[in-house]
Amino acid sequence: MREFVGHGIGKEMHEDPQVPNYGKRGYGPLMKRGLCIAIEPMITLGDRQVIMERDGWTVRTRDRKCAAHFEHTVAVGAGEADILSSFKFIEEVLGDKAI
């Protein structure tokens, strides 16, 4: 699923840099202190080719196998990144049913 990438986030929802979910370490955009990015890993059990549905929003894999998308927003710091997004509320609502 290489058509979709993580991205910078700030005044606008989607900003540079684009952050691919694939590649070689050390070859992507430079992550500078203060940069906020949305990291959006995607996995599929089958083909990485995708089809965009007519509604302009829904995406599925060409072979219709299961796929998943997850997102975290992080701020690049001097050491470790700070995770700005939290899914704690999902765990609180779902309790034992949370994955």
Role assignments for model-derived ranges:
Residues 23-99:
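Charged, cofactor-coupling segments
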